């Protein structure tokens, strides 16, 4: 088997750094979970884009007469939350679907609930916190309408992010409970060390992939279009 080379994030060649993670949905994730895993990845991308747009909104806020603190904090949130959200909640759910690990699911639930709370706070928009939320944006319309309109864009995006985060958390939790997962299973994995054993993880991944492939390749009973009658010679 060829050695997997880290490919994420895809950095330009002139940057003297190498990717930190290996990510391949089709190779790592069982087919029945690829769609949900990709949706969570797109949600992480939306969160990153929203933080970048928020930086622009805070710049407009600064130009319109707002304080420089918001712009500085917005820049800090962008460079801090973008990699942290990937490591803290996307990688655990990626690993959870890859290896069917209850411990990874629990790690995702814990960190993603924090992500949901942060998204709600960002959508609310407390002035001085470096986010263009509803309170900050609406209150700034009386100061500079042009800047407030620009601030309205990340405000809407933060709101959408909060709604999508709640939906995603509900979907993953429903799937996890429906598949028989529980907190006791996560505790068992922690106690036995199965969550960090690469051989156990590979075995779980192979079992999940094999089950999915077997379900897709299961032969279907075929029926002949021509009826076959059996006649008895006894009258």
Curated annotation (Swiss-Prot):
Name what induces it.
By endoplasmic reticulum stress.
Localisation per UniProt entry: Cell membrane; Golgi apparatus membrane; Golgi apparatus, trans-Golgi network membrane; Recycling endosome membrane
Topological region Cytoplasmic: 1-39, 89-102, 170-235
Tell me which GO cellular component terms the UniProt record holds.
Golgi membrane; membrane; plasma membrane; recycling endosome membrane; synaptic vesicle membrane; trans-Golgi network membrane
Q: What is its main location?
A: membrane
Q: Which UniProt keywords apply?
A: Cell membrane, Cytoplasmic vesicle, Endosome, Exocytosis, Golgi apparatus, Membrane, Protein transport, Synapse, Transmembrane, Transmembrane helix, Transport
Membrane topology (UniProt): Multi-pass membrane protein
In Gene Ontology terms, what is a biological process of this protein? protein transport
Annotated GO MF terms: protein-containing complex binding
Which tissues carry this protein? Expressed both by neuronal and non-neuronal tissues. Expressed in brain, stomach, thyroid, spinal cord, lymph node, trachea, adrenal gland, bone marrow and in the different parts of brain. In thyroid tissues, it is expressed by the follicular epithelial cells. In the adrenal gland tissues it is detected in the zona fasciculata of the cortex region (at protein level).
Q: Which residues are listed as membrane-spanning? A: 40-60, 68-88, 103-125, 149-169
Which residue ranges are assigned to the Extracellular compartment in the record's topology? 61-67, 126-148
The record ties this protein, via InterPro entries, to: SCAMP (IPR007273)
What the record says about family reads: Belongs to the SCAMP family. SCAMP5 subfamily.
Q: How does it assemble?
A: Interacts (via C-terminal part) with SYT1 and SYT2; interaction with synaptotagmins making a link with the SNARE molecules. Interacts with SLC9A7.
Q: Which PANTHER family match?
A: SECRETORY CARRIER-ASSOCIATED MEMBRANE PROTEIN 5, SECRETORY CARRIER-ASSOCIATED MEMBRANE PROTEIN SCAMP
Describe the task this protein carries out: Required for the calcium-dependent exocytosis of signal sequence-containing cytokines such as CCL5. Probably acts in cooperation with the SNARE machinery. May play a role in accumulation of expanded polyglutamine (polyQ) protein huntingtin (HTT) in case of endoplasmic reticulum stress by inhibiting the endocytosis pathway.
What is the protein name for this chain? Answer: Secretory carrier-associated membrane protein 5
Q: Which organism is it from?
A: Homo sapiens (Human)
């Amino acid at each position: 088997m060829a050695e997997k080379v880290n490919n994420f994030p895809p950095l330009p060649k002139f940057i003297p750094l190498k990717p930190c993670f290996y990510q391949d949905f089709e190779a790592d994730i069982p087919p029945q979970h690829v769609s949900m895993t990709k949706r969570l990845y797109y949600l992480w991308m939306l969160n990153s884009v929203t933080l970048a747009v928020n930086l622009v909104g805070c710049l407009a806020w600064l130009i319109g007469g707002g304080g420089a603190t918001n712009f500085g904090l917005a820049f800090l949130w962008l460079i801090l939350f973008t990699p942290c959200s990937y490591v803290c909640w996307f990688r655990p759910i990626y690993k959870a679907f890859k290896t069917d690990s209850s411990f990874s699911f629990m790690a995702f639930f814990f960190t993603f609930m924090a992500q949901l709370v942060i998204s709600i706070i960002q959508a609310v928009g407390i002035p001085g916190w470096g986010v263009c939320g509803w309170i900050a944006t609406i209150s700034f319309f009386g100061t500079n309408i042009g800047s407030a309109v620009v601030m309205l864009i990340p405000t809407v995006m933060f709101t959408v992010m909060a709604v999508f985060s709640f939906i995603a958390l509900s979907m993953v939790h429903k799937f996890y409970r429906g598949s028989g997962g529980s907190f006791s299973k996560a505790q068992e994995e922690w106690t036995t060390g199965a969550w960090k054993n690469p051989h156990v993880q590979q075995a779980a991944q192979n079992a999940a992939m094999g089950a999915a492939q077997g379900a897709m390749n299961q032969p279907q009973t075929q029926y002949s279009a021509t009826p076959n009658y059996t006649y008895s010679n006894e009258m």
